[in-house]
């Protein structure tokens, strides 16, 4: 897109999103932070699985700390979207209940979703 290759187009797009109430600064902070912190969390797991690091109290504490950082960015996303964390979880539960009749995971339904199932 033009906004991805031209600074003025990007600037115009950011203004447009701001005028629509997108709270783009907080959304971008949240999106970048969730991915960065998720990567740090996964890095610890990767080292335990593939590089012989132990599942030790220190590594567990490190994961908890990274998870806390990740949760802070999730909170930023919730604030940007003006939705509570509890509402996000409730919506996810409702989505999964609709996707998996009977409440049990099924590979078929995970790969063959109904129309509108995000």
State the predicted function of each range:
Residues 1-118:
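Flexible "arm" and connector segments at domain edges
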